């Protein structure tokens, strides 16, 4: 990308990198299973952008001046240690592998809903569409570099916004409204989980869970922009003020994340 992405492209790129299949699958699933605990994701995406506003522009300036293009480059250059840079790069790869695996699970879920690679078929028939999708994505990214996810992000993010807006209006109108949704969710969360002997969760964070909620949200906020794909997106910005401007604009995605989390409650209210 040659550090040439402006505010508009960077907004879609960073938003697309951060809000992925995890957003659509894991967050609603946690809200579905445990209630308010799943909204930690909304809290940490609110906290992360002030951190980005303060530290990311300085990171970009040093990387641009020294020609760094990855977190490993940055650490190796700043600390003069090839081993430390290699350790950071290896840690980034290992930490990203589960993240990538979740994206593949998301793709598989979408293909299954579309009737492609049905679970009822053989393992090969089920996995072949996923392998093809991954190969196409990998080849496109290899050939086009960072421009590939940036271009895809335009289409993907627009579809996300449209899908969420339609779903948040249409689905409640079909299953009894928000009062019914929260009523059903609350009733389920109050029931006792046989495995733990405690309620499944609650609609609001209870005092006993406040520290767990807060530390999980804070730790996630501190870690989000340490992921290699997020740092690379920052490095691709054209100027320092592009990063600051995006730190101010990216919370729009947090609003959408909050609406997506509500899908978990909606799923609970859908008749079996």
Give, region by region, the residue ranges found by the protein language model:
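Transmembrane-helix boundary/entry motifs in multi-pass membrane transporters
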Residues: 1-16, 62, 66-95, 238-240, ...
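Loop-to-helix junctions at membrane interfaces in multi-pass transport proteins
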Residues: 2-5, 9, 26-27, 32-43, ...
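The first (N-terminal) embedded transmembrane alpha-helix
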Residues: 15-23
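Residue-level recognition of pore/gate-forming positions within transmembrane alpha-helices
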Residues: 17-18, 45-49, 92-96, 134-138, ...
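Membrane-embedded alpha-helical segments in integral membrane proteins
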Residues: 23-30, 105-109
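Membrane-helix interface residues
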Residues: 35, 79, 143-144, 153, ...
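Helix-loop-helix module between adjacent transmembrane segments
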Residues: 39-141, 219-223, 232, 264, ...
């Amino acid at each position: 990308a040659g550090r040439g992405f402006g505010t508009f492209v960077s907004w879609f790129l960073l938003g697309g990198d951060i809000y992925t299949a995890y957003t659509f699958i894991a967050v609603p699933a946690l809200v579905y299973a445990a209630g308010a605990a799943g909204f930690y994701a909304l809290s940490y995406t609110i906290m992360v952008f002030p951190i980005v506003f303060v530290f990311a522009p300085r990171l970009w300036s040093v990387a641009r001046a020294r020609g760094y293009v990855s977190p490993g480059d940055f650490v190796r250059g700043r600390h003069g240690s090839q081993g430390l840079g290699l350790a950071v790069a290896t840690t980034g790869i290992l930490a990203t592998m589960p993240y990538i695996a979740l994206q593949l699970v998301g793709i598989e879920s979408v293909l299954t809903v579309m009737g492609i690679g049905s679970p009822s078929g053989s393992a090969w028939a089920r996995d072949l569409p996923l392998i093809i999708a991954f190969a196409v994505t990998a080849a496109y990214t290899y050939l086009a570099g960072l421009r590939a996810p940036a271009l895809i992000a335009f289409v993907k993010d627009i579809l996300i916004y449209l899908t969420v807006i339609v779903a948040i209006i249409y689905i409640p109108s079909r299953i009894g409204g928000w009062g019914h949704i929260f009523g059903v969710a609350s009733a389920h969360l109050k029931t006792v989980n046989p495995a733990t002997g405690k309620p499944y969760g609650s609609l609001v964070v209870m005092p006993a869970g406040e520290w767990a909620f807060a530390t999980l949200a804070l730790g996630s906020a501190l870690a989000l922009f340490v992921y290699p794909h997020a740092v690379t997106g920052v490095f691709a910005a054209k100027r320092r003020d592009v990063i600051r401007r995006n730190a101010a604009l990216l919370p729009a995605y947090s609003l959408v994340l909050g609406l997506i989390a509500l899908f978990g409650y909606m799923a609970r209210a859908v008749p079996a």
